[in-house]
């Protein structure tokens, strides 16, 4: 068994693709519209689906908003240069929720940004070799 994907429901698929692909560096792996079901699925990631876990972005055509609730935490992405990544995101107008710095009660350097739908994305500084 292996983890294939995690799914996020999104209001504006183009805005979400812009965030995850253009700003976060993922690739659009596949996109398919389902007219009879009135939804579109887009799969994005850093690798092919058969090589690792990806994100499924689901856009339901007739839904204008979602209640995020408080059960879901965040998506985490490893980044090589967390300061440069946060600078680039800030310049692009992304909502940085937490500036880069050590996590509470630890030394791992993290930051948080919000995607267009309000999902939290944790950025984790990858160890330098």
State what each model feature region is.
Residues 1-17, 72-77, 124-129:
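N-terminal beta-strand motif that seeds the catalytic metal site of vicinal oxygen chelate
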Residues 38, 71, 107:
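Exposed loop/turn and edge beta-strand positions of beta-sandwich/beta-sheet ligand-binding modules
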Residues 7-52:
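Core segments of cupin and vicinal oxygen chelate
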């Amino acid at each position: 068994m292996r983890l294939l994907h995690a799914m996020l429901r999104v209001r504006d698929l183009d805005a979400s693709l812009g965030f995850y692909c253009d700003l976060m560096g993922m690739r659009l792996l596949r996109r398919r519209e389902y007219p009879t079901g009135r939804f579109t699925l887009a799969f994005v990631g850093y690798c092919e689906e058969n090589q690792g876990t990806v994100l499924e972005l689901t856009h339901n055509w007739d839904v204008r908003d979602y209640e995020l609730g408080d059960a879901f935490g965040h998506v985490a992405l490893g980044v090589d240069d967390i300061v440069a990544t946060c600078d680039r995101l800030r310049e692009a107008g992304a909502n940085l929720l937490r500036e880069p710095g050590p996590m509470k009660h630890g030394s791992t350097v993290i930051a948080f940004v919000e995607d267009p739908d309000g999902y939290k994305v944790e950025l984790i500084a990858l160890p330098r070799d």
